[in-house]
Curated annotation (Swiss-Prot):
GO biological process, one term: inflammatory response
Protein name (database record): C-X-C motif chemokine 9
Species for this entry: Bos taurus
This protein's record includes keyword Transferase: no
Keyword Secreted attached: yes
Region listing for Disordered, in residue ranges: 91-125
Length: 125
């Protein structure tokens, strides 16, 4: 009887413990119903998300978030959008390199020498 109590409690614990996590599927359908035909300037972008086809949505989806908060779905087949993605990835990589450089950059402090401590230079004539 003593051995079955911990086993029983273990089984209850395992069945009552909930599994937490982020679902792999977004919301069960495509996020982009219509795509905008207008061109977006790279400087007005805040974020650019690209979603690959999944069981819930057969299309590749590209969602652009502007600095003013508006979101737009872009057509991934347009050459302008492909160029926009390349420029965005280039900007993101450049920002990562800048952060990495600042993170590991060490500055060397050199003490200043006062004029009175400097060795005097003799004039030769």
């Amino acid at each position: 009887m003593k051995k079955s109590a911990p086993l029983f409690l273990g089984i209850i614990f395992l069945t009552l413990t909930g599994v937490q996590g982020v679902p792999a599927i977004r919301n069960g359908r495509c996020s982009c119903i219509n795509t905008s035909q207008g061109m977006i300037h790279p400087k007005s972008l805040k974020d650019l998300k690209q979603f690959a086809p999944s069981p819930s949505c057969e299309k590749t989806e590209i969602i652009a978030t502007m600095k003013n908060g508006n979101e737009a779905c872009l057509n991934p087949d347009l050459p302008e959008v492909k160029e926009l993605i390349k420029e965005w990835e280039k900007q993101v990589n450049q920002k990562k390199k800048q952060r990495k450089g600042k993170k590991y950059k060490k500055t060397k402090k050199v003490p200043k020498v006062k004029r009175s401590q400097r060795p005097s230079q003799k004039k030769t004539t």
